[in-house]
A protein has these predicted regions:
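Flexible glycan-contacting loops in extracellular carbohydrate-active proteins
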Residues: 196-225
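Extracellular glycan-recognition modules
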Residues: 46-49, 58-66, 100-155, 181-186, ...
Length: 250
């Protein structure tokens, strides 16, 4: 840091798409004042491209991305996602999604996963069986959604695999979809830290929009609770893990 207060180091690479140049003292002050300064022991914090923690008042309609990109979060649909204090995995609230016509959307050039490695994860709470309900799709509208995670006939699905495992009911569960390469069986789904499916996924995901809580159509939304949705452009888990201690979410 220059003693005269001009610059603080070089700007982290994940913020390059937002602001060129170095960080000033005012940049740091404003982040701290807005509680946006990231203090984390997470070794992958600079690889995070989306981090929704769903904190807010009951029936709240404001959603904040806590990741380095500070993405604007949009509510899409006529029903609308809300924050609910009725149940939460961490802190005081979670996101409550309607069964239809209500999901969240974020967009940024850095959201494109390409053919690289990634970890998509979240905590979910489901009170009743899921029929055709979306967890994450890429794209901006019904006609171009690419479904990544969903629940169909109460079975979990990921891109390229179906009917993997039943959706747990009436308890929080952690779901992590990890692509550690594009070779055979390098795309893995973990339920509560235990590997339940592995397949091949060599898709090039160039979409810069995430539609969270929706299936192939806005008529099929998540319809349940979600907490701590996070996407990381890195492999967080190579083997079974403990989601209570190994995720850096709590």
């Amino acid at each position: 840091m220059r003693r005269e207060g001009g610059f603080i180091g070089s700007q982290p690479p994940w913020d390059g798409a937002n602001r060129p140049g170095n960080w000033s003292v005012l940049d740091v002050y404003n982040r701290q004042r807005q509680s946006l300064w990231i203090r984390s022991s997470d070794p992958f914090v600079n690889n995070v491209v989306c981090d929704l923690r769903f904190e807010g008042l009951n029936n709240g309609t404001v959603f904040v991305d806590s990741g380095p990109l500070l993405l604007p979060v949009s509510r899409v649909g006529t029903s609308g996602v809300i924050t609910s204090t009725t149940r939460s995995k961490y802190e005081s609230a979670s996101g409550l999604f309607p069964d239809s016509n209500g999901y969240l959307s974020v967009t940024h050039p850095n959201l494109a996963l390409g053919a690289g490695n990634f970890t998509i994860e979240m905590w979910l709470f489901v009170a009743t069986s899921r029929s055709n309900n979306g967890i994450l799709s890429l794209g901006t509208s019904d006609s171009i959604f690419t479904v990544i995670l969903s629940a169909v006939s109460n079975f979990l699905r990921v891109a390229g695999s179906s009917n993997i495992a039943s959706v747990p009911l009436n308890s929080w569960f952690h779901l992590a979809y990890v692509r550690e390469g594009t070779g055979t069986n390098q795309a893995k789904l973990y339920l509560n830290g235990t590997l339940i499916n592995q397949a091949t996924n060599a898709s090039n995901y160039n979409q810069t929009f995430y539609s969270i809580g929706v299936y192939f159509s806005s008529g099929f939304c998540w319809g349940a609770n979600m907490d701590n949705f996070r996407v990381t452009k890195a492999v967080r888990y190579l083997t079974n893990f403990n989601p209570e201690t190994d995720t850096y979410m709590s």
